[in-house]
Amino acid sequence: MDDDSRGLRVMATSEKPLSPRDPPAEFLPLLKQSGVFSESRFEEVRSKVLAGDYPIDAQELARRLIQDRLLTEYQAKRLLSNRPGSLMIGRYVILEKLGSGSMGRVYKAQHRMMDRVSALKIIAPEISNNERVVARFQREMRLVGKLDHPNVVRAFDADKDRGILYIAMEYVAGESLGQRLRTKGPIPAAELVG
């Protein structure tokens, strides 16, 4: 089991990944179960498959949905691996993995109703039962929620879904702080307090 499946307590319909020639009869239920698409978007895709406008094998269908920007590569990989439950946390659709650390993982995610892209920080389930970790996470959520500075990412939401603690924060595209420091060196103080 990989880091993502452990970290999100995957709910799959079976343990068997889809083979390259599995029909959409296998892929479409996973797509629906994943929650990535609204009901109307799912029906639109299903209709295109039935009409012959979309490919009939699972791999080709996934490729086409990526090409049409309806799925991300990360989402397609999870679905083809028969892990649809790992693509929704609360009201957030997971788009891609951004990174991981000792406390958990960070994903690029989109709020289903608000259509806002966020960085979704998820505490690893292995440590989310630890009272000290939960207390630390709750303190972090409260503190980040009170911060308002142009150089600090804002927190939008925090909750628990299926036992998974998460916080949704402002998504800032570009390199990480670690990457920035490695490539350009220390950041001048004037730029930090800017």
Can you annotate each of these PLM segments?
Residues 1-95:
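Short N-terminal regulatory/linker segments that flank and modulate the kinase catalytic core
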Residues 23, 31, 66, 77, ...:
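Conserved ATP-binding/catalytic core of the eukaryotic-like protein kinase fold
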